[in-house]
């Protein structure tokens, strides 16, 4: 993939990619700060800021002005917060990409953060927090994160806890932004039917004068916790279960083998978990696995939502599939199919401008360089059955597993981590 890349004198990294066949253009601004950079007294700040940038900026002082300008050309603007990044994006017809860039740059650089808006949006965020806490399927993922990263921001809810969010102020939000929205943490990517030289100049004019700020180191990831099981008693028709293991950081040499292993285990309707737990045993409607990779840590998690009376059976069946990956090499036919699945997902992602802009910005922020599709395909094709069995045996051992469950009290009280040797923590429904 050919693209243009420049680092501005202040440290902002810029990537632009002309896609002559596209009718759209996409802006992606990745800022290398998320909930991981927070403390117990300001947890939820990154997410709060993500909300606040839509409330008004220096040149567009109301939320309606921002939305009307973007939607007036048929476009969209969005933002999201993760553990290590906050993302601001826009998707528009290609002829309007400079407008989209101007709006997104305005949101990142000059949000008003007015006291009245903070008070109003606080109520919205509190309701968002309550919504997720009411949903057992969301709560169980929070519990497994807390087990995997004990007493650490990587294990906390991105939106924060209600008592802390109630105390956040406009002054605190501004201070956090001034500290962490440093040019060296900002990546701007534009893809679509654009003029690359024009796009590069436009980014330079909007981000080139940001003042340089000293870097702030993130708190290192914690060691794995001793508590292996965490459950929440909550009325409902289902038990929601997560089984998790610590994995590897973003740049670890085993990352791609674990990616392939995860696809075999729990991605898609042809994955082993889906075929065994849903198609064969009819235990669940939703069963899957997923991975997350951070700068210095990572994890792999299995999720299933099941009838409470069959929760133990579902856990046993899922662990049996993991044990099979440790004990038996993956057959050649399955390995070829899953390699093609992973490669195909990469190729399809790059068919549209949104995928390309996020691809460029994400790799630049997290990897410090852009891997070509051809390089990734070569890496994937080089992973063999022995590699998969090795990483399964190293990372997915039963004594390294953690278990979280949310559901009826009698059900979750019976569930423990696979080796059954660690503390069981019960919570009251809230």
Give the label of every model feature segment:
Residues 11, 18-70, 253-265, 273-275:
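Active/ligand-binding-proximal structured segments within catalytic/core domains
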Residues 2-3, 7, 18, 65-222, ...:
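Charge-rich, well-structured scaffold segments of protease-associated domains
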């Amino acid at each position: 993939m050919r693209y243009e890349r420049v680092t501005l004198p202040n440290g902002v990294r810029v990537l632009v990619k002309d896609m002559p066949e596209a009718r759209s253009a996409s802006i992606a601004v990745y800022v290398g700060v998320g909930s991981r950079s927070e403390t117990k007294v300001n947890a939820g700040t990154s997410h709060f800021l993500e909300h606040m940038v839509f409330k008004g900026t220096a040149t567009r002082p109301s939320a309606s002005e921002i939305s009307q300008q973007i939607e007036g050309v048929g476009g969209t603007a969005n933002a999201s917060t993760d553990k290590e990044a906050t993302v601001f994006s826009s998707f528009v017809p290609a002829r309007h990409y400079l407008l989209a860039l101007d709006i997104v740059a305005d949101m990142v650089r000059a949000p008003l953060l007015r006291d009245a808006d903070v008070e109003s949006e606080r109520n919205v965020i509190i309701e968002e927090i309550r919504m997720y806490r009411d949903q057992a399927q969301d709560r169980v993922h929070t519990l497994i994160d807390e087990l995997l990263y004990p007493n650490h921001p990587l294990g906390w809810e991105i939106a924060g806890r209600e008592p802390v969010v109630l105390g956040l102020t406009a002054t605190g939000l501004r201070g956090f932004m001034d500290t962490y929205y440093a040019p060296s943490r900002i990546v701007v990517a534009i893809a679509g039917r654009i003029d690359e030289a024009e796009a590069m100049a436009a980014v330079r004019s909007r981000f080139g004068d940001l003042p340089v700020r000293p870097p702030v180191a993130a708190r290192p990831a914690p060691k794995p916790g001793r508590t292996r099981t965490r459950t929440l008693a909550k009325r409902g028709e289902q038990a929601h279960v997560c089984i998790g293991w610590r994995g590897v950081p973003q740049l670890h040499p085993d990352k791609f083998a674990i990616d392939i292993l995860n696809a075999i285990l729990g991605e898609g309707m042809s994955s082993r978990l889906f075929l065994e737990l849903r198609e064969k045993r009819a235990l669940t409607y939703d069963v899957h696995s997923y991975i997350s990779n951070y700068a210095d840590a990572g994890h792999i998690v299995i999720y299933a939502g099941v009838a409470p009376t069959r929760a133990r059976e579902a856990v046993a069946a899922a662990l049996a599939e993991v044990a099979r990956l440790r004990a038996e090499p993956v057959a050649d036919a399955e390995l070829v199919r899953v390699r093609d699945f992973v490669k195909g997902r990469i190729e399809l992602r790059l068919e549209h401008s949104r995928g390309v802009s996020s691809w460029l910005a994400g790799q630049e922020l997290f990897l410090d360089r852009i891997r070509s599709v051809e390089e990734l395909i070569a890496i994937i094709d080089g992973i063999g059955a022995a590699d998969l069995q090795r990483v399964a045996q190293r990372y997915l051992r039963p004594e390294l597993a953690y278990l979280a469950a949310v559901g009826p009290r009698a059900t979750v009280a019976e569930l423990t981590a696979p080796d059954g040797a660690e503390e069981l923590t019960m919570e009251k429904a809230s």
